[in-house]
A protein has these predicted regions:
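Active-site core segment of subtilase-fold serine proteases
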Residues: 156-249, 254-258, 264, 268-282, ...
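Catalytic-core segments of hydrolase enzymes
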Residues: 226, 269, 278-366, 372, ...
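Bacterial N-terminal signal peptides
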Residues: 9-21
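Primarily auto-inhibitory N-terminal propeptides
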Residues: 25-153
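Structural recognition of the beta-strand scaffold that forms the well-ordered cores
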Residues: 54-55, 113, 137, 186-189, ...
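Hydrolase catalytic cores
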Residues: 229-230, 251-253, 282, 358-422
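C-terminal subdomain of the subtilisin-like protease fold in secreted/lumenal serine endopeptidases
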Residues: 277-288, 294, 299, 306, ...
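Protease zymogen maturation seam
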Residues: 130-186, 199-200, 268, 417-445
Length: 445
């Protein structure tokens, strides 16, 4: 245990009387009536069995235009049924079984999960599908993991935890909140389920949708912790999010495993990113990592082209680059190590990783509780909250411009984020204690 805990102990001791306090539970955020975009079609399985592929087909309805007036009907119109029948026929022709499907209107494609026989070679099937004129491409279903370094450690219920929040002590967010709170900025948290009834998260979720199995969204550790760091409510006795007035889009694309680890796959993540793009997300948080993935690659390209800030987590101890943090244009974030060591490389073509607090972070936990968490997942959440603060002040800034503000090339420290200096550069005056050159690296081209 590191030296952080003795400091925490003093604070938690004065909070012990809160341990038995009843917590008011509120209903999980419900989608507005009539909005089919918030009611995902249940998947056959959120964790596809082995021997499955994703097959992307050029099967849009005759009236469909990818960027025109998509209002949610595309997922359940009569054209979808006819497209699925054609996909079933294609599957039979190639000896496959259709398992699930989802429209990807931002790409102008339909995505199908197809299972192949145990004895078949996926490489051979993918090669055969590539020769079919209906097929845009086919790929394996990849797995992704949340970037938490250890299971959460419980904390006493207690903005009394604010004094031990790194965002409070080092980023001075209480001072920054006099200038910006991320008001009404939509932040898509693509993760495991978020506890929408938690007292620090009640009313913070504009959307709470389940792209894993289509059922009610369960309260899970990783997603709840990430959501709290980004946008926990201020002034109600728990923690304070970096952007407490941001509007969270809770998009469950990952699920909690028995060992409390977090797992996602290409299909569930693709559905959630597609939704975030279509429904006005201004920031997308991806506190996860896995292998390169063509579907997610294409979707991230669209998100970045539309000016959405995308944040990915990277493990500083990993042997190689991790996707999606190494996708060009994504803000790669690692946990801030002791001693201010150099940032890890996110990949050959990516920018150096940003460093943000990611060790012993107090945050929200399911069941109206709080816990301490560590890992680059939570460092990424800090940066997503920071982007929300910046977006309120400069809503038209591009992701590249925001990155230059976070990590100006002429700064003495090009590794650790200086939150006060960043906001001060946007405002052209000091927002809190800072010595930054406020005229350099602004929101210019």
């Amino acid at each position: 245990m590191n030296t952080f805990w003795p400091r925490v102990g003093a604070v938690l001791a004065c909070l012990a009387w809160l341990a038995g306090a009843p917590l008011a539970a509120e209903a999980q955020a419900a989608p507005p009536a009539g909005d089919e975009t918030l009611r995902p079609v249940p998947a056959a399985s959120h964790d596809p069995a082995e021997h499955t592929l994703l097959v992307m087909l050029r099967l849009p309805a005759t009236h469909f235009r990818p960027d025109a007036s998509y209002g949610g009907r595309y997922i359940d119109d009569s054209g979808r049924a006819s497209r699925r029948r054609r996909a079933e026929e294609l599957a039979r022709q190639h000896g496959l079984t259709l398992v699930d499907d989802w429209p990807m209107p931002v790409l102008g494609l339909d995505c199908y999960v197809m299972r192949y026989p145990d004895q078949e070679s996926p490489e051979r099937i993918i090669a055969n599908l590539a020769r079919d004129p209906q097929v845009e491409w086919a790929q394996p279903v990849a797995s992704f993991d949340g970037m938490a370094s250890a299971p959460p450690a419980p904390a006493t219920e207690g903005d009394a935890l604010y004094p031990v929040q790194p965002a409070g002590r080092y980023w001075h967010v209480a001072e920054l909140h006099r200038e910006t709170t991320g008001r009404d900025i939509k932040v898509a948290v693509i993760d495991s389920g978020i506890d929408a009834s938690h007292p620090d998260l009640s009313g913070q979720l504009a959307v709470n949708a389940n792209f894993v199995d289509g059922g009610a969204t369960p309260a899970e550790n990783h997603g709840t912790a990430v959501a709290g760091i980004i946008a926990a409510r201020a002034g109600n006795g728990g923690i304070v999010g970096v952007a407490p007035q941001a509007k969270l889009m809770g998009l469950r694309a990952c699920w909690q495993q028995p060992d409390l680890a977090t797992r996602c796959n290409s299909f569930t993540l693709g559905k959630a990113i597609n939704y975030a793009i279509l429904n006005g997300a201004q920031v997308i948080n991806l506190s996860l990592a896995g292998p390169p993935d063509r579907l997610l690659d294409r979707l991230l390209d669209v998100a970045l082209e539309r000016g959405i800030g995308v944040v990915g987590a990277i493990d500083a101890k990993a042997a190689g680059p991790a996707f999606p943090a190494n996708h060009r244009g994504v803000l790669a974030v690692a946990s801030q190590p002791a001693g201010g060591k150099a940032a890890p490389a996110a990949g050959a073509e990516a920018d150096p990783a940003l460093l943000a607090p990611g060790n012993d972070i107090p945050t929200t936990a399911p069941g109206g509780r709080w816990s301490f968490v560590s890992g680059s997942s939570y460092a990424a959440a800090h940066v997503s909250g920071m982007l929300a603060l910046m977006a309120q002040l400069q809503p038209k800034a591009t992701p590249a411009q925001l990155r230059r503000l976070l990590q100006p090339g002429d700064a003495l420290n090009t590794v650790n984020i200086d939150a006060c200096a960043t906001i001060s550069r946007l405002l052209h005056h000091c927002s809190c204690s800072c010595t930054a050159n406020l005229t350099q690296r602004g929101v210019g081209p």
